[in-house]
Amino acid sequence: MNVLSYSINTLKGLYEISGVEVGQHFYWKIGGFQVHAQVLITSWVVIVILLGSAIVTVRNPQTIPTDGQNFFEYILEFIRDVSKTQIGEEYGPWVPFIGTLFLFIFVSNWSGALLPWKIIELPHGELAAPTNDINTTVALALLTSIAYFYAGLSKKGLGYFGKYIQPTPILLPINILEDFTKPLSLSFRLFGNILADELVVVVLVSLVPSVVPIPVMFLGLFTSGIQALIFATLAAAYIGESMEGHH
């Protein structure tokens, strides 16, 4: 009976897990539009965390930096290094964009593991990390696409489109397809990794004692940071590529 009872409880847990699906959403109706409330709520929380921590830490810069100021200066230096390595000497104007991408994705990813989203109940679906939703990752990828098109056009003008027939016009369809696959790969890589990480933790918490999933959660924090770095690095690389014209 104990085995049967355990099996039934396990099946119930799996059934509850199956409710965590990509298609469950909670919407706000504003005028004639449906607004994806889950993503907006969690994104606002992440933005408030970023702005609040930055304002509190660096509103009064000190000649002898405080620990918080040192931390933010280190982050800025890190983002500048990534931008300069991928874009080149003209990296300066792109540091805010690359930094915004990196910090938003990084904090969003970590919020999925560290913030107790589940305690806030919604009529439909549940709150999770913003990057756990395909709408967020696609939006970030499209912003990156707009950025590297803008970078190429602002530097080369209409001559930028000449890259599509290099080194031979035969490669025109492939070169066009490449620009369409870049945002797809960026968005689905980030979305898939974050969604899979959260689902693995949910499954383990449901099936085994609470202490066992802790190492997996720490691994998830590490991979979440890596995913933010990969996204920002690739975005900078695409911008640098569009300005230089090399594939």
Swiss-Prot record:
PANTHER family: ATP SYNTHASE SUBUNIT A, CHLOROPLASTIC. Key component of the proton channel; it plays a direct role in the translocation of protons across the membrane. Belongs to the ATPase A chain family. PROSITE patterns: ATPASE_A. Coiled coil: none annotated. This is ATP synthase subunit a, chloroplastic. One of its GO terms (cellular component) is plasma membrane. Keywords: ATP synthesis, CF(0), Chloroplast, Hydrogen ion transport, Ion transport, Membrane, Plastid, Thylakoid, Transmembrane, Transmembrane helix, Transport. SUPFAM superfamilies: F1F0 ATP synthase subunit A (SSF81336). Pfam families: ATP-synt_A. It comes from Populus trichocarpa (Western balsam poplar).
